[in-house]
């Protein structure tokens, strides 16, 4: 594997050892109804049941435990990160486990339930504008003021390696899997999974799932160069508004087989379908992968790619904001 990547599979193996006693082995569930709709065998990796309600605890915990093992004589004074919510919760939880103060820079538009959860885990919240530039500038300032260490939500190698442990579990839980479908924002989970899958089972496909309104990963693959979103995207999938970055892009460029995009209505329909048929309260970000498999475009994937695992990335839903559910009921399915 290319030595220019920020992580190798060995890093994922180390992460697995580092975090396995502190996280859940999340289940893989199936749905005969969704199998019937898609004509494929679908498997759902339920990271909504993970500690803090999303996969993000894997990377955050691996990063913080790595910092401590690297400097056992003195813990970091603080850890600092920017997050739309899930990484912030995960970092807060992991920092509290290790007795380290955490500061999370959150856009004011982040779901209220995620902001409250960050505070409940003991972190201090600092608000930013929605743009990447605003979040990163404030994160740097807070890190300087607190003498803290920044833990990037998707470009930090230890975070990427931690997210890759999802694929180690899936390959054991679904031995005959033909493909994984993974939501992508900054690309930490996608990159970690791609490194792991291509190291252990190169024939297994890795597909990225992305909102059409935040399609920087698709555009980057199409153009063959890193192409960030030109402006803050508007999508219900709030967990994947970030663009892929310098560390995740080379892995995605080389190891991800294809990128599929879906509309906002497709995301809403898929999310509600999982709620109603599988009784799983996923957040819309997790619904993006389901929407992809339900989409017309996905029918171009060869029929022999039969056994597909969709990573349900999280379940931190702001129930007070679901005004779109009634509106969606009034529409025909896309």
UniProtKB/Swiss-Prot annotation:
Residue numbers binding pyridoxal 5'-phosphate: 86, 154, 185-189, 313
Keywords: Allosteric enzyme, ATP-binding, Calcium, Isomerase, Lyase, Magnesium, Manganese, Metal-binding, Nucleotide-binding, Pyridoxal phosphate, S-nitrosylation
Modified residues (N6-(pyridoxal phosphate)lysine): 56
Binding-site positions, Ca(2+) 3: 210, 214, 216
Catalysed reactions listed for this entry: L-serine = D-serine; L-serine = pyruvate + NH4(+); D-serine = pyruvate + NH4(+)
Cofactor: Mg(2+); Mn(2+); Ca(2+); pyridoxal 5'-phosphate
PTM-bearing positions, type S-nitrosocysteine: 113
Residues annotated for Mg(2+) 4 binding in this entry: 247
Annotated positions binding Mg(2+) 1: 13
Residues binding Ca(2+) 4, per UniProt: 247
Binding site for Mg(2+) 2: 178
Post-translational modification: S-nitrosylated, leading to decrease the enzyme activity.
GO biological process assignments: D-serine biosynthetic process; D-serine metabolic process; L-serine metabolic process
Highest taxon of source: Eukaryota
GO CC, any one term: cytoplasm
EC number: 5.1.1.18, 4.3.1.18, 4.3.1.17
SUPFAM superfamilies: Tryptophan synthase beta subunit-like PLP-dependent enzymes
Pfam families reported in the protein's UniProt record: PALP (PF00291)
Function description: Catalyzes the synthesis of D-serine from L-serine. D-serine is a key coagonist with glutamate at NMDA receptors. Has dehydratase activity towards both L-serine and D-serine.
Quaternary structure (record): Homodimer.
Protein name: Serine racemase
Organism of origin: Bos taurus
